[in-house]
Amino acid sequence: MDPHGALFFYLCLLAAQVVLVETLSDLLVLMKRLEQPVGRGLSSRARHIHSLEQKLLNASFGGHNLTLQTNSIQSLVFKLSCDFPGLSLSSTTLTNVSQVRAPHAMQFPAELTKGACVTSRPAELRLICIYFFTAHLFQDDRNSSLLNNYVLGAQLDHRPVNNLQKPVNISFWHNRSLEGYTVSCVFWKEGASKSSWGAWSPEGCYTEQPSATQVLCHCNHLTYFAVLMQLSGDPVPAELQVPLEYISFVGCSISIVASLLTILLYAQSRKQSDSTTRIHMNLNGSVLLLNVTFLLSSQMTLPTMPRPVCKVLAAVLHYALLSSLTWMAIEGFNLYLFLGRVYNAYIRRYLLKLCMLGWGFPALLVLLLLMIKSSVYGPCVTSLSKSQENGTGFQNVSMCWIRSPMVHSILVMGYGGFTSLFNLVVLAWALWILCRLRAREKALSPWAYRDTAMVLGLTVLLGTTWTLAFFSFGVFLLPQLFLFTIFNSLYGFFLFLWFCSQKRYSDAEAKAEMEAVSSSQMTH
């Protein structure tokens, strides 16, 4: 090569390097600009992201791929052909990726380039991947929580990719268990919101959880993907864990002792044929079972315990809770019959039918769940919020319980809400009747006060305290946690006090009747 030709080649090479450096510099500046807080409108967020996409698709570089990295954004560019065999990307193999972050991966099928190569065979196709490790650019109207705050995006050339036969697989991992959380794979749908430049949508995506720490998304298109995390209620502050556990342990222990004493007093009672008293005893028995299984549930999640044992205990705990709630409703129904003056109406095998409902119906529900999907029971994680020093935002506390959020919503919250609502209606109706009785009297008799206290005490003890479970949010969270824990852990003790007061009243009434009979016999 002559000196002039060599000089020309050198100048061309130098110019190409200068262009490449300027291109990379512009891309890094734009990526760093995206890391800064911006407005919510389309003109700010969408414009910056689309600008980055276009620059990556048109960037000039040597080799087959390009990787750019800033603090919270990573951009990848790949040169593909129509003979694309597929591509697997993993954060563990990508360069310049912080090992502190939770891992992620994307897998593209060979079908990806078929749509672009149907009518023509372009010499080069560009696949770009933009990974956002911050979610501030993709905030929707609901301010949704994203797993790890990861948003992983991909785009093929300047054309949309939809309805793939073999989906794109996107894997998200977390360094803590995700059991007990509702996770769903979503994509960013532009123009789906009036107040933001888009919204999260699950269309075209299928969610799978291969393990407790991994979420696998199968999506039939290319766009920006994330995993929504939906917690059932506000997370419990971690610093309250110890006092709440202590209150629960002490309260349940007291209730267990009180329930055993109640059974002992009932065994010694002379008035064992009374249906109302027997209903009390069935409720007491279900509460005793509930307290015992609750105390055991946290111990059975230890690594040394077999998993089937935890599953069985979770099913028994759920059965005990449903049975307790059912017997609370039965108590309310029995009170309704008593105050409605229809208690003396003969109901054939009344107590047997109530037992079939109180013990049999919950057993049927639990058995159906076990037959349909036994995995709904097992080690479950309770959400605890904590400081952000480790970057996770929550920690895990396990117990043997229901793992399915849908089952928990229907057969715990829904079942308990229906029971509480029924007893609240009975309470309001009973108070209305007592107010009418008082209005007929010129002066309030002590019996009116006793009846009011009886109805209030009985109905409050029959499940109305469970309505506190529906106030676990906002400013109500802290008082609700302690009130709910105190009242419901001591539920067996309150039943014991109620039984003692009723027994004392019955004994006094029986004694008065005997004295009246004796005095009548003496006068004759």
Swiss-Prot record:
Full protein name: Adhesion G-protein coupled receptor G5
Residues carrying sugar: 58, 65, 96, 143, 169, 175, 390, 396
Main subcellular localisation: membrane
PANTHER family registered for this protein in UniProt: ADHESION G-PROTEIN COUPLED RECEPTOR (PTHR12011), ADHESION G-PROTEIN COUPLED RECEPTOR G5 (PTHR12011:SF326)
Residue span of region GPS: 185-235
Post-translational modification: Autoproteolytically processed at the GPS region of the GAIN-B domain; this cleavage modulates receptor activity.
Domain remark in the UniProt entry: The Stachel sequence (also named stalk) in the C-terminal part of the extracellular domain (ECD) functions as a tethered agonist. In the inactivated receptor, the Stachel sequence (also named stalk) is embedded in the GAIN-B domain, where it adopts a beta-strand conformation. On activation, the Stachel moves into the 7 transmembrane region and adopts a twisted hook-shaped configuration that forms contacts within the receptor, leading to coupling of a G-alpha protein, which activates signaling.
Annotated Gene Ontology cellular component terms: plasma membrane
Entry superkingdom: Eukaryota
Region called Stachel, residue ranges: 224-232
Activity regulation remarks: Forms a heterodimer of 2 chains generated by proteolytic processing that remain associated through non-covalent interactions mediated by the GAIN-B domain. In the inactivated receptor, the Stachel sequence (also named stalk) is embedded in the GAIN-B domain, where it adopts a beta-strand conformation. On activation, the Stachel moves into the 7 transmembrane region and adopts a twisted hook-shaped configuration that forms contacts within the receptor, leading to coupling of a G-alpha protein, which activates signaling.
Transmembrane segment boundaries: 247-267, 285-305, 320-340, 352-372, 414-434, 454-476, 481-500
Protein's membrane topology: Multi-pass membrane protein
Residue intervals of the GAIN-B domain: 74-235
Record function comment: Orphan adhesion G-protein coupled receptor (aGPCR). Ligand binding causes a conformation change that triggers signaling via guanine nucleotide-binding proteins (G proteins) and modulates the activity of downstream effectors, such as adenylate cyclase. ADGRG5 is specifically coupled to G(s) G proteins and mediates activation of adenylate cyclase activity.
Organism: Mus musculus
